[in-house]
Amino acid sequence: DELDPGGSFDTSGEASNTKLEGLQHKYPPTVLLLSTNRCAMYCRHCFRKRMVGLSEDELNRRADEAIAYVSEHEEITNVLISGGVALMNPNSVIERYLEGLCAIDHIDLLRFGSRIPVTLPERIYGDEELLELFERYAKRKTLFVVTQFDHPRELTEQAKKEIGRAHV
């Protein structure tokens, strides 16, 4: 599809599951929030390449609508905050999502999709404010950072240490 000019830019069928701009609801208990279009690197296998170039404001201004949608759908028990890479957002945006979603009783699990532990681990271990946010909100809901290491050498000692320190 990628090299065929007639191929689909939406190879995973995301358009049919999009309920709001930046929110996909394919499976009843789960929503995917596309919180940013930024990444620390662009992966060869990425299926969201078509999103590169959208303004950050355009994606981030939808957070309140997304939180309202989740609040109105009690079947949703877990939220995957991704993008792009969710941890490329400023801490204020991350806190906006955490505060809004942690206030919803029927949410049990919040996941952040991020290759930051691989591509920019300093974003975690160099930012005490981010670590404090995770520590504070992990007391209210279960938090995970869902990441992907493509090769064992990508899993550095620093990455292992900081993932544990992040309380997620």
Stretches with model-predicted labels:
Residues 57-58, 85-89:
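Alpha-helix capping and helix-loop boundary segments enriched in small/acidic/polar residues
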